[in-house]
Amino acid sequence: MEIFNDLSRKLVFPIDYPSQRRVAKLTDIILGSGTLVSCLLGFYAGSLSLTLYAFAAAYGLALLLVVPAYGKYRQQKLAWVGSAAATTKDL
């Protein structure tokens, strides 16, 4: 189990902005609920193609909601550390 935790920490790239974290959560919610709804819909209808079309619609919805809002990813600016030259200049 420890190997999987180490591997997941190495494969996940850090999220820089808090807005990116919110968008990643929104994407996970849309795709997760879309997967659940499409599986249930396809199961009750007995159609694999309906399952795939419903998931494609959820994927398209996620793309429409997340991709065009690139400016919203940078609403909350990060506080960068000052340069080392500015701190050692006073010595």
From Swiss-Prot:
Gene Ontology biological-process entries: protein targeting to ER; signal peptide processing
Lipid bilayer topology: Multi-pass membrane protein
Membrane side Cytoplasmic: residue ranges: 1-28, 72-91
The keyword Phosphoprotein is assigned to this record: no
Main localisation: endoplasmic reticulum
Cell compartment(s), UniProt: Endoplasmic reticulum membrane
TM segment ranges: 29-48, 52-71
Stretches of the chain found on the membrane's Lumenal side: 49-51
Keywords associated with the record: Endoplasmic reticulum, Membrane, Transmembrane, Transmembrane helix
Classification via InterPro entries: Spc1/SPCS1
GO cellular component: signal peptidase complex
Keyword set includes Membrane: yes
Homology family: Belongs to the SPCS1 family.
Function: Component of the signal peptidase complex (SPC) which catalyzes the cleavage of N-terminal signal sequences from nascent proteins as they are translocated into the lumen of the endoplasmic reticulum. Dispensable for SPC enzymatic activity.
Subunit composition and interactions: Component of the signal peptidase complex (SPC) composed of a catalytic subunit SEC11 and three accessory subunits SPC1, SPC2 and SPC3. The complex induces a local thinning of the ER membrane which is used to measure the length of the signal peptide (SP) h-region of protein substrates. This ensures the selectivity of the complex towards h-regions shorter than 18-20 amino acids. SPC associates with the translocon complex.
Protein name according to UniProt: Signal peptidase complex subunit 1
Biological source species: Eremothecium gossypii (strain ATCC 10895 / CBS 109.51 / FGSC 9923 / NRRL Y-1056) (Yeast)
